[in-house]
């Protein structure tokens, strides 16, 4: 099965227009002939405050606010940190990571970090980040490329917003996203600095408690988090693991 990793955000045409220096929402037009799901998507986008905030703050996707909330609460990103991000397209988490770690060097008096972002999809460059587009993180070649790019640096935070293409078969989809989490965990164990952090996306299912227990073997704390920016009807949660203890099982 071929997995497509993405930050769960699709590129859609903006539904806003500039009037008198301020932005006003447009109502969806020409809905006749569109599918019901397309009409529902347009209506939901117009009613979603995070879509508007993302546009106003120049984030590529509303999902930026999920990471912002996690970082505001748990302090996982700091200036000078080295960050690895998996499932990075279209780049909104990358934008946040660059800002919070000062990877773009805009904070003159703060240490400059580094951000490495990978996704199976190609996506536009983010200033301050090293992008690996069109690469399958689970492949040995991709992980070799990441190690080469990191050189001798250890990672202070690993982020994963990866999700497989949903098949509609619940058990298969749950197994697929759990397998992705373990793939990220294994890489994090090999590449993380002491006291590093890890964030992975999960879909609520019976495999999550075991994953939490396995993460607790290597991190001091693990919390299950659903940011306010996650849609209410979404099954997604994030496991936030803090303070890496080392790869040796304790």
Swiss-Prot record:
Its EC number is 2.1.1.-. One of its GO terms (biological process) is rRNA processing. It holds the Pfam family FtsJ. Its main location: mitochondrion. It is found in: Mitochondrion. GO terms for cellular component: mitochondrial matrix; mitochondrion. InterPro entries: RNA_methyltr_RlmE, RNA_MeTrfase_FtsJ_dom, rRNA-MeTfrase_E, SAM-dependent_MTases_sf. Belongs to the class I-like SAM-binding methyltransferase superfamily. RNA methyltransferase RlmE family. S-adenosyl-L-methionine-dependent 2'-O-ribose methyltransferase that catalyzes the formation of 2'-O-methyluridine at position 1579 (Um1579) in the mitochondrial large subunit ribosomal RNA (mtLSU rRNA), a universally conserved modification in the peptidyl transferase domain of the mtLSU rRNA. This activity may require prior 2'-O-methylguanosine modification at position 1580 (Gm1580) by MRM3. Essential for late-stage assembly of mtLSU required for efficient translation of mitochondrial DNA encoded proteins; methyltransferase activity is not required for this function. This is rRNA methyltransferase 2, mitochondrial. The lineage of its organism: Eukaryota, Metazoa, Ecdysozoa, Arthropoda, Hexapoda. The gene is Mrm2.
């Amino acid at each position: 099965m071929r997995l497509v990793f993405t930050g769960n955000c699709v590129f859609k045409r903006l539904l806003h227009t500039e009037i008198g220096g301020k932005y006003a929402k447009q109502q969806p037009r020409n809905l006749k002939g569109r599918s019901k799901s397309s009409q529902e998507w347009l209506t939901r986008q117009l009613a979603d405050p995070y879509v508007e905030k993302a546009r106003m703050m120049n984030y590529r996707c509303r999902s930026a606010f999920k990471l912002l909330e996690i970082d505001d609460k748990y302090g996982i990103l700091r200036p000078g940190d080295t960050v690895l991000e998996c499932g990075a397209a279209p780049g909104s988490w990358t934008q946040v990571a660059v800002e919070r770690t000062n990877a773009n060097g805009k904070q003159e008096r703060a240490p400059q970090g580094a951000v490495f972002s990978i996704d199976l999809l190609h996506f536009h460059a983010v200033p301050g980040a090293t992008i690996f587009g069109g690469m399958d993180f689970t492949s040995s070649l991709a992980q070799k490329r990441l190690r080469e790019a990191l050189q001798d640096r250890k990672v202070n935070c690993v982020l994963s917003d990866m999700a497989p293409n949903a098949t509609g078969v619940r058990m298969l989809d749950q197994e697929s996203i759990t397998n992705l989490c373990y793939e990220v965990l294994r890489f994090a164990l090999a590449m993380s600095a002491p006291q590093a952090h890890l964030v992975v996306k999960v879909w609520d299912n019976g495999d999550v408690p075991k994953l939490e227990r396995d993460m607790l073997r290597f991190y001091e704390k693990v919390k299950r988090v659903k940011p306010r920016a996650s849609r209410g009807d979404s099954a997604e949660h994030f496991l936030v693991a803090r303070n890496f203890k080392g790869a040796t099982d304790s």
